[in-house]
Amino acid sequence: MSAYLDTLKFKLAGTILAAALVVPASVAMSQQNPSSQDILNALKPKPPLTRSLSVSPAEQAKKAEQDKFVDTLRNRPTRSLSMDDRQQIATVAETRPRIDLEIKFDFNSANIAQSAIPDMNSLGKALSDSSLKGSTFVLAGQTDGVGGEEFNQDLSNRRADAVKRYLIDKFGLASEHLVTAGYGKSRLKNKNNPSASENRRVEVVNMADR
């Protein structure tokens, strides 16, 4: 019986390890009430796994095109972004350091809830860190799946703008380094439960990759 249990434990451990290894590296971290250090660690560009592999000309051209696109976003109002712009932001963000924050707002409002102020201050402190100096950040507003598309799109725009204003007013962050984008209910994190609280979030992306 002991040998059987040892074998079973070994197989179970192997299964857990295999499951951990298949989690995509690009999946955004998500935390409730993260510290400023948690946010900073998530947003710091990760060093390449190896320095021996050279970047192909095609990859260099792709990165240059993405960086050029990011430059065009600075100081643009959230509502000026087209659907294609928002999709391109999401595509670039897939490979960049990012974190999902459940920033709470008043019901059907862009007013940041008092209970969310500690999280906002943690975010502001992290983005003010000298190690992130010069980075451009995307603040992507997301809503849950309750309500109409037009309403949620507008609400996500206003909530992303509210987060940006707070960071500028309270932490003196440069406006041109904070890009806001609203996605409404188009990118639900929990598609099985559209009304789930984790769908109401702000995704913060460091558009730098090194």
Annotate each PLM feature.
Residues 97-103, 108, 133-135, 174-176, ...:
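Envelope-exposed proteins and targeting segments
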Residues 38, 68, 115-122, 150, ...:
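Extracytoplasmic/secreted proteins, especially bacterial periplasmic and envelope-associated proteins
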Residues 103-111, 146-151:
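Short coil/turn segments at secondary-structure junctions
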Residues 21, 92-96, 130, 171, ...:
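Sterically constrained small-residue positions within well-ordered secondary structures
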Residues 142-210:
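Periplasmic OmpA-like peptidoglycan-binding domain that tethers envelope proteins to the cell wall
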Residues 87-93, 105-140, 164-169, 204, ...:
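Periplasmic peptidoglycan-binding/anchoring modules of Gram-negative envelope and division proteins
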Residues 2-94:
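N-terminal targeting leaders that direct proteins to extracytoplasmic destinations
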Residues 62-63, 98, 109-117, 153-156, ...:
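Solvent-exposed, acidic/flexible segments
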